Amino acid sequence: MKDLLKFLKQQSKTEEFNGIKIGLASPDLIRSWSFGEVKKPETINYRTFKPEREGLFCARIFGPVKDYECLCGKYKRLKHRGVICEKCGVEVTQTKVRRERMGHIELASPVAHIWFLKSLPSRIGLMLDMTLRDIERVLYFESFVVIEPGMTSLERGQMLTEETYLDALEEYGDEFEAKMGAEAVLELLRAIDLAKEIEQMREELPSINSETRRKKVTKRLKLMEAFYTSGNKPEWMILKVLPVLPPDLRPLVPLDGGRFATSDLNDLYRRVINRNNRLKRLLDLAAPDIIVRNEKRMLQESVDALLDNGRRGRAITGSNKRPLKSLADMIKGKQGRFRQNLLGKRVDYSGRSVITVGPTLRLHQCGLPKKMALELFKPFIYGKLEGRGLATTIKAAKKMVEREVAEVWDVLDEVIREHPVMLNRAPTLHRLGIQAFEPVLIEGKAIQLHPLVCAAYNADFDGDQMAVHVPLTLEAQLEARALMMSTNNILSPANGEPVITPSQDVVLGLYYTSRERINGRGEGMAFMSVAEVEKAYATGAAELHARVKVRITETIIGDTGERTEQRRIVDTTVGRALLSLILPAGLSFDLVNQNMGKKQISKLLNTCYRQLGLKDTVIFADQLMYTGFRFATISGASVGIDDMVIPDEKYTLVADAEAEVLEIQEQFQSGLVTAGERYNKVIDIWASANEKVSKAMMENLSTETVINRDGVEEKQASFNSIYMMADSGARGSAAQIRQLAGMRGLMAKPDGSIIETPITANFREGLNVLQYFISTHGARKGLADTALKTANSGYLTRRLVDVAQDLVVIEDDCGTHEGLTMKPLIEGGDVVEPLRERVLGRVVALDVFYPGTEDVLAPRNTLLDEAWCDKLEEYSIDEVIVRSVISCDTDFGVCAACYGRDLARGHIINHGEAIGVVAAQSIGEPGTQLTMRTFHIGGAASRASAENNVQVKNSGSLKLHNAKHVTNSDGKLVIVSRSSELAVIDELGREKERYKVPYGTVLEKLEEAAVEAGDVIANWDPHTHPIISEVAGSIKFVDMIDGVTMTRQTDELTGLSSIVILDVGQRGTAGKEMRPMIRLLGANGADLMIPGTEVPAQYFLPGSAIVNLEDNAQINVGDALARIPQESSKTRDITGGLPRVADLFEARKPKEPAILAEISGTISFGKETKGKRRLVITPADGGDHYEEMIPKWRNLNVFEGEKVERGEVIADGPEAAHDILRLRGIHNVANYIVNEVQDVYRLQGVKINDKHIEVIIRQMLRKCLITSAGDTDFLEGEQAEVSRVKIANRELIAQGKVPATFERELLGITKASLATESFISAASFQETTRVLTEAAVGGKSDQLRGLKENVIVGRLIPAGTGYAYHKTRNEARAKKNEPVVVNKITASEAEQNLADLLNLAGSQD
């Protein structure tokens, strides 16, 4: 018995650890792990199936094959535990030690570890400062390397071929030493004195000038320091002893028929042992050098294959022509250890089945088939049966359950009561893909799902399957109920809107109920209460849509929460009055007194949640659903072919369009328009025809004419089923109806270009063969796209989760005063996103004042909720500085104040909330809805870019942003600066519209002038770029010589002649160096200056500029001196959809990025080279000037002598995020990425809160580049974690030392994930080999800070409910590094262990 207790004690030891360190194993360490040397390649005896002695499965080394029994059978049973049999040498113990005991192989010759050799950058190569090519030649016995030069002219590490080696031998004899193979490399590595090398390199670093050399030395220094600090020795990168994996981890299983199934590793090990033994024999025999060398090379190759097959040369294949799976392959990739077994596991107590609708369920319920429940809850049922005394033993209970006795069902009901189960539908794209429900037992075999949670699961009932999981422990049940219950997940974590909004039938039913019909039965009746309306409807006195007067009672909840009732008479319909029955007390009847479309219902639920809280909303949502289903049934809405009414005008419209197309075709044939213009015009004609047809069709469908009570004709909204479905938002859209009853319109080819013959037919008329063929293009592309999209979107989500996984809320307030400036988003004349939506749920960073005063409206640290937002709107505040995670100062996490409101709960975020993962899911989940394509600008899209004026939509006053302007002779303003913007401000000072206006725009109104809606306030020529004069005077041509730098062209139509400047490439040699320009002279012939400066007014003319003036002409301020034709900017493909989002998060440089000014100053052009111009910026304060070479074909936005600000655009193009960060700062780059990502999602109608994108940006910005090291341990030019640098700086400042300075760096999400501090997390993401190699060399230790690392080591994650556990552990650890108390073994575990033991002891009697 004492033994038993000892046994139980030994079972409960859990290792307490705070980190995991990885390093290089020294040969002695490997020997210390080992339980014996494996000397023979034999595995098991094929007759007896017993392992061979000293072989790969040897029982003496690795442990017994059967529990508590030695190999020869002399000692059996527990009583001999720990005895080592003297006959066969096997220890009597459990067989599971064969999973943990390792062996080793003593290698006859050292072998390089391929990871440190071949995984780039090669660590051995960096260490020895030799090229990989050279080292490989030494290792694989192709050349010698000098180890000890002695007194010769050779130098250490010099390569010698066979011939040169022999020559050297003749010349020097044995003065020197040169070897080949791994021994040579081993000696070289052993000879390195780390401390000395490091000191030497640190001394020479400052004096190195060449950039590449400096980089190389820094790299080498970092590697050396990593070795030095970690205590690894460089020679350990060469193996002398090879560890052998425990045999149960590389099993060999006899199949029937005398064959064996085996792990590939056994083959690889056998190869190594064979070659090693042969090499030993050859060395004993003192065989010729060449044979030994060959054997050593083969040994090296076989060890390479064992460690990482296929890394060097061709992979070794097995009998089935497949490469063998090496140790490296075991851990990497989707099927590797990390992703297959550590990050995701299969679990028991789960089942799966098809789902069907459960329209009668409550929101927190799901229907569970009895069969499934019986299987899933078996242990609970056994326990209950035994506890009740219905069964005497577990065995008896088992029998009862198998027979399905009547009592079993009663017990099952009891067990299931209030025991939540979790339902999951794959793919689980966000956290709402697993929710908890209370099971309701049902007959049949399908799980029933509540219709309102379908949206969260993205489930439909066309054969979808779902999995059920049973939370077993009390804590698990508690979490399932409190956190995961479907009733607690009403709001979407992505945008804070309700996610349980009704859709489809329910919407249709509610919409139908709330419609009104003119002259319906019972119109004009008046009712004293809603109950009376119900009676009238039930008796048929009034129909559902009749317009009636009703006295309703509303409950009003005051600010303090007291309830008052008030009655009033409203004009409404019978249906709406019935809807008011389910309206919860406290909501106004006006919310349902309207046509209830999907949008309205969503708003109704949202209002309900904000005003009345969770419980009322859940009950109300259920009631809405039941009512919706009921009235949808009553409505009898159905679709017949006659519902698709084709408008009569369609045929005339199509005929007109065809006539126009013919006309253009004729113009084209007579050469008046080009092919491109013709194509664009044709597509335009058809696009507008399509619009007209669909407009006519919608008017036709949406209204019908009826006779009202007075016998007069009146129009009302139609009750056509198709129209109702689309209008309510239940199913279908205007675009789909257009295809049914209008015309299908233009189709695109698979490459995205538009086919110019449209499909004029619609589906009701039917398509002919050609039309059908054209439409198959689109349909197929759609299917292909969907397949690609899913994979791409999944990969994006994976990268996002990986980069953000360790971001958790860890404190209340970091105290920072920084934040992002939020303004309403305005594009052109539309407010795309009002300020309220952008700041709702955020915390104010700096006090917001009442407009025009110093009084504080919203003090710092106010959480802006709905009421506050109303207040801001009331005072027409149009910019607020709010806290953001990007500027949060918390180390290794964020604070609650910088994050603001938890969108899914509606209050400030809790500690321990895993905001990183939520952000990644919120951005990734709608990924499948985004498009995959790149838009080719063709036809309809390209004309948007050729705007030439600004027409305002609102009245107000005009305001200019960063615009320089001059006043021309007509008294109008002409803009002479780039990136100017023009805004319309209303009387309260709120910005209503904002437009970008180019250089050369003529404004019709002065600044601050009042404008009316519809006014055209600015004009410009979209096709040319003018050069505007800023002074008045006479012009003088410089360097403009006809036929050398310019030519004269005469316009055939007008007869006017103009001067065209030649490009440098078109000029003869004489004109190459000349620089054509226009100088402005005053009346006395002296140079004029540009106003306010000492710079003479001279304007350089670039190639292909057109000048319409003659020499010595007089001009005024604001006149155009010349025009540069804008090549209709080459139709660039706009990358849209998913690829665009991925590009932004990966921070990829665009192909031809915009060129931004690196410093502020004055522009001038230096000497040109072939194909490039030299742009020089000279700062005003006389500092160093900046030069950049720019290709000639880039269209520059700047002229000589112009002033630019740092970060201004010099040449147009897509802006690169890295440039924005460098030149305009962190907040600008954050705004840029947020807005660009939001643009893509907005196009698809997906709402995501900005916060989530900011969280990802924070993670992209977590590294920095050290610019000067100060007194820290960092190296200049090193990449370091910002938090680490900040912590180090704080300590230094406290001690009065010099802190390090750094520049923030923007990393793409893949790079950022791989650069994380935790090597476990990085290794499980991508490039496993590289990450592990790097970590091992540096002897890194993983502090298990993030979620992923903790999942991998099998702990609770430091977020959510696991946050408290980690907090107490860390506190205990900090208090005094005492061991944390481990839960002692519980009674039930002891019982279980005992049972196991008895089974073990009893099984071999």
Swiss-Prot record:
One of its GO terms (cellular component) is DNA-directed RNA polymerase complex. It is an enzyme of class 2 (transferase). Its EC number is 2.7.7.6. Binds 1 Mg(2+) ion per subunit. Zn(2+) 1 binds at C70, C72, C85, C88. Zn(2+) 2 binds at C814, C888, C895, C898. It catalyses: RNA(n) + a ribonucleoside 5'-triphosphate = RNA(n+1) + diphosphate. Mg(2+) binds at D460, D462, D464. Keywords: DNA-directed RNA polymerase, Magnesium, Metal-binding, Nucleotidyltransferase, Transcription, Transferase, Zinc. It holds the Pfam family RNA_pol_Rpb1_2. SMART domains: RPOLA_N (SM00663). GO terms for biological process: DNA-templated transcription. GO terms for molecular function: DNA binding; DNA-directed RNA polymerase activity; magnesium ion binding; zinc ion binding. Its cofactor is Mg(2+); Zn(2+). Coiled coil: none annotated. The RNAP catalytic core consists of 2 alpha, 1 beta, 1 beta' and 1 omega subunit. When a sigma factor is associated with the core the holoenzyme is formed, which can initiate transcription. Belongs to the RNA polymerase beta' chain family. DNA-dependent RNA polymerase catalyzes the transcription of DNA into RNA using the four ribonucleoside triphosphates as substrates. PANTHER family: DNA-DIRECTED RNA POLYMERASE, DNA-DIRECTED RNA POLYMERASE SUBUNIT BETA. This is DNA-directed RNA polymerase subunit beta'. It comes from Shewanella baltica (strain OS185). The lineage of its organism: Bacteria, Pseudomonadati, Pseudomonadota, Gammaproteobacteria, Alteromonadales. The gene is rpoC.
